Regions:
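Short acidic, S/G/P-rich loop/turn micro-motifs used as interaction or catalytic elements
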Residues: 18-19, 68-70, 83-86, 182-184
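Short strand-coil-strand connectors
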Residues: 54-56, 194-197
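Short, low-complexity cationic-aromatic patches
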Residues: 2-5, 20-21, 53, 67-72, ...
Length: 250
């Protein structure tokens, strides 16, 4: 089989409690910007609670540094493939199966391919391939089928939400900017050279700003009538532009 394109699946970032609360409580984000969910994910290996925003093929999540006992700036970038058996072979990487709990059982969720050792404390990355069994068994009231594409999984996620925006702005994530120390940047760039993802990731030296995610670029499904800026906490700013793009800075 020819190798499938490796795309962005999702990212997460840990923010301070004030920023997390401002994001969680924003009526604009939940009612206009994107499909939103606060959830606790129970896996066989761990559990965690965060807030999620779903696009068409990509999504992203935030963690509260106080609630999850994570450091502000902890970041992960998950890549994904859209076909069974499309996971690449990367020498030295570790492959395992991640499950997700539902109805008192752990359902095979996705296969994960991770660098060994992980990139750094507070910086993770992996490639994921959904299993056909996941959509066949998880929340079947939201649809039928055994699809493994990012779009099919996100469609199921959104279909079981209690409330969804009628016409959300968000289409997908198109790029990330990360600020990393030199050694972490070198390891991340080496990993990306092995993965060869079809998404733009830019790197900045650490300088005086926070570690990890500095900004996210988005493609929008519709344009705001004029440039729109929304702030969350002390330094998190989301800007929507009339050219159907947006940037969220941290």
């Amino acid at each position: 089989m020819a190798q499938s394109s490796i795309e962005l699946n999702h990212f997460y970032v840990t923010v301070d409690s004030a920023t997390y609360a401002a994001i969680e409580q924003s009526s604009f984000l939940k009612q206009e910007f994107a499909n939103f969910e606060k959830r606790t994910t129970v896996r066989a290996d761990r559990s965690y609670t965060g807030i999620y925003f779903y696009g068409t093929k990509t999504y992203f999540e935030f963690f509260d540094s106080a609630q999850e006992k994570r450091a502000v700036g902890e970041t992960a970038v998950a890549f994904g493939v859209d076909a069974v058996g499309a996971m690449p072979d990367i020498e030295g990487a570790h492959r395992d199966l991640i499950t997700r709990g539902w109805n008192d059982q752990q359902i095979p969720w996705f296969y994960r391919l991770s660098p060994v050792p992980q990139l750094a404390k507070g910086l993770e990355s992996w490639i994921m391939e959904y299993t056909p069994e996941f959509l066949a068994k998880w929340r079947p009231e939201g649809g039928v089928g055994q699809g493994v594409t990012r779009a099919e999984v996100l469609k199921r996620y959104k279909s079981v939400l209690a409330e969804t925006p009628a016409d959300a702005y968000l289409d997908d994530v198109t790029g990330l900017t990360l600020a990393l120390p030199a050694d972490e940047m070198e390891r991340m760039m080496h990993w990306m050279g092995q993965v060869k993802p079809a998404v733009t990731i830019r790197f900045l030296p650490m300088g005086q700003g926070p570690h990890g995610l500095r900004s996210v670029s988005f493609r929008l499904r519709k344009a705001p009538a004029e440039r729109m800026t929304v702030r969350f906490g002390a330094r998190s700013v989301l800007t929507l532009r009339p050219d159907k793009t947006a940037i969220w800075e941290f």
